[in-house]
C-alpha cells in the first residue's frame, strides 16, 4: 500500500496519533482501494464486522476505488454487506470496475453514490484454465455459474433485464457517473459532502 499518513487528534487526555485508515474507521468509513483479493477482502470483511459490533444500527460508508479482482473475494464482501445489520452505503471515488462496480451496485438502496468524474465498468467474469479436458470443463462450468449469479444480482440491483445485463457485460461496458445512475447501478451523483 505504500506510505500511510498519520493524523493527530487532540483529546481531553492529550494527543493521539492514528493511521488515516483507523481514523476513518472511527467515522464508520471503510476504504476499498486497489485490486480485490483474499487479503483485501479479509480486511474489508473484518472492518464491516467490527463496525456492526460497535453499532448495529448506524450506516457504514464503503468508499470504492478499484479495478476489480478475484470473484470469490468480492463475493465474500458482498455476502458480509448483506449479512450485517447496518446499511452499507457505497461511494465510487475514481473508478469501480468489474468486481468494484458489482460491489458499488450492492450498496443499500438509495445509498449508492458516485463522485462526478468517476468511471464505472461492468463485464463478464474473466478466467482461464489449463490441464486435463475434464478439469477445464469443471472450471468453465464454474465460471459460467458465477457469470449467471453475478448477472442476476446486477439485474436485481439495477432494474435492468437479465438479457440486457448479459448483453452489456459481454464486453467491457464503461459508464460515467451520470450514465451509471441512469443505468441503475447507483442512486445519485454526489457533488459535495453534506455531512
From Swiss-Prot:
Q: Name one GO molecular function term.
A: serine-type endopeptidase activity
Which keywords does UniProt give here? Cytoplasm, Hydrolase, Protease, Serine protease
Main location, first listed in the record = cytoplasm
Q: What class of enzyme is it?
A: hydrolase
Localization per record: Cytoplasm
**Enzyme active site:** 98 (nucleophile), 123
Q: Which reaction does it catalyse?
A: Hydrolysis of proteins to small peptides in the presence of ATP and magnesium. alpha-casein is the usual test substrate. In the absence of ATP, only oligopeptides shorter than five residues are hydrolyzed (such as succinyl-Leu-Tyr-|-NHMec, and Leu-Tyr-Leu-|-Tyr-Trp, in which cleavage of the -Tyr-|-Leu- and -Tyr-|-Trp bonds also occurs)
Q: Which PROSITE patterns match?
A: CLP_PROTEASE_HIS (PS00382), CLP_PROTEASE_SER (PS00381)
Q: What processes in GO biological process is this protein linked to?
A: protein quality control for misfolded or incompletely synthesized proteins
Alphabetical list of InterPro entries matching this protein: ClpP, ClpP/crotonase-like_dom_sf, ClpP/TepA, ClpP_His_AS, ClpP_Ser_AS
One GO CC term on file: endopeptidase Clp complex
**Which CDD domains does the annotation name?**
S14_ClpP_2 (cd07017)
- The EC number on file is 3.4.21.92
Known partners and oligomeric status: Fourteen ClpP subunits assemble into 2 heptameric rings which stack back to back to give a disk-like structure with a central cavity, resembling the structure of eukaryotic proteasomes.
Q: Which family does it belong to?
A: Belongs to the peptidase S14 family.
Protein purpose: Cleaves peptides in various proteins in a process that requires ATP hydrolysis. Has a chymotrypsin-like activity. Plays a major role in the degradation of misfolded proteins.
**Official protein name in the record:** ATP-dependent Clp protease proteolytic subunit
Source organism (scientific name)? Helicobacter pylori (strain G27)
Highest classification ranks of the organism: Bacteria, Pseudomonadati, Campylobacterota, Epsilonproteobacteria, Campylobacterales
Amino acid at each position: 500500500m505504500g506510505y500511510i499518513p498519520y493524523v493527530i487528534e487532540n483529546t481531553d487526555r492529550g494527543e493521539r496519533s492514528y493511521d488515516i485508515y483507523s481514523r476513518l474507521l472511527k467515522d464508520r468509513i471503510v476504504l476499498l482501494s486497489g485490486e480485490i483479493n483474499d487479503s483485501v477482502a479479509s480486511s474489508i470483511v473484518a472492518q464491516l464486522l467490527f463496525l456492526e459490533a460497535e453499532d448495529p444500527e448506524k450506516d457504514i460508508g464503503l468508499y470504492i476505488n478499484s479495478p476489480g479482482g478475484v470473484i470469490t473475494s468480492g463475493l465474500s464482501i458482498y455476502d458480509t454487506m448483506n449479512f450485517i445489520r447496518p446499511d452499507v452505503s457505497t461511494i465510487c471515488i475514481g473508478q469501480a470496475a468489474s468486481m468494484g462496480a458489482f460491489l458499488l451496485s450492492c450498496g443499500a438502496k438509495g445509498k449508492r453514490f458516485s463522485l462526478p468524474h468517476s468511471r464505472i465498468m461492468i463485464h463478464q467474469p474473466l478466467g482461464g484454465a489449463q490441464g486435463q479436458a475434464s478439469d477445464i470443463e469443471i472450471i468453465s462450468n464454474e465460471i459460467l455459474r458465477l457469470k449467471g449469479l453475478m448477472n442476476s444480482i446486477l439485474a436485481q440491483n439495477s432494474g435492468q433485464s437479465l438479457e440486457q445485463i448479459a448483453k452489456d457485460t459481454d464486453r467491457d461496458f464503461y459508464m460515467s457517473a451520470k450514465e451509471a445512475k441512469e443505468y441503475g447501478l447507483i442512486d445519485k451523483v454526489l457533488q459535495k459532502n453534506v455531512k
